[in-house]
Design a protein with these regions (language model features):
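Long, contiguous amphipathic alpha-helices that act as assembly "spine/axial" helices in icosahedral shell
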Residues: 1-13, 38-49, 53, 82, ...
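Alpha-helical scaffold segments that mediate packing/assembly in large oligomeric complexes
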Residues: 1-36, 145-159
Length: 159
């Protein structure tokens, strides 16, 4: 679900599939992303969902050239929770109210314990099958905003 994979007959599209991710490299640009979501009258609790690489970049990104304060402090950006996950595509993030995503499951979860396929390796194979899909509740473009994080350009002393 957190990938950029296109959907198919046997798996749903990831939430990063088919979206154009705007590149950000400064705290000011990140504030503009938050403003776009706020302008959509999103009422729920907003969160950031990002890759571990995006989190690492934001942990090193200063809020401005006049401060040593960093964009990501602990596990939040100005009090907004940040969730980092290795399933999110490299340097990408999503920001918004994730309660606007509904997941559905159909039928039972099938669990198969196969002691034969890997018997020569003294192992068992476990197969789990489930029918799952997800959709946004609101079609508004800015309920959840997508982007990519890049390291800020190095500043030249005296400029």
């Amino acid at each position: 679900m957190l990938s950029a994979d296109a959907g198919g007959t046997n798996k749903p599209a990831g939430i990063f599939s088919g979206v154009t991710a705007k590149n950000i490299s400064s705290y000011a640009e990140l504030c503009n992303v938050e403003a776009a979501v706020d302008d959509s009258n999103v009422k729920g609790e907003r969160k950031y969902l990002m890759s571990n690489k995006a989190k690492a970049i934001l942990r090193c990104m200063p809020k401005s050239s006049l401060t040593t304060e960093l964009v990501l402090d602990g596990n939040d950006i100005d009090g907004t929770p940040v969730i980092a996950n290795s399933d999110v595509p490299t340097t990408q993030y999503a920001y918004g109210d994730f309660s606007n995503i509904v997941m559905g499951t159909w039928g039972n979860v099938d669990l198969i314990i196969d002691p034969y396929t890997l018997a020569a390796e003294n192992s068992i194979r476990i197969v789990v099958n489930a029918f799952v899909d997800w959709k946004k509740v609101r079609k508004d473009e800015n309920v959840i905003v997508y982007g990519k994080v890049s390291a800020p350009a190095a500043s030249t002393p005296g400029k």
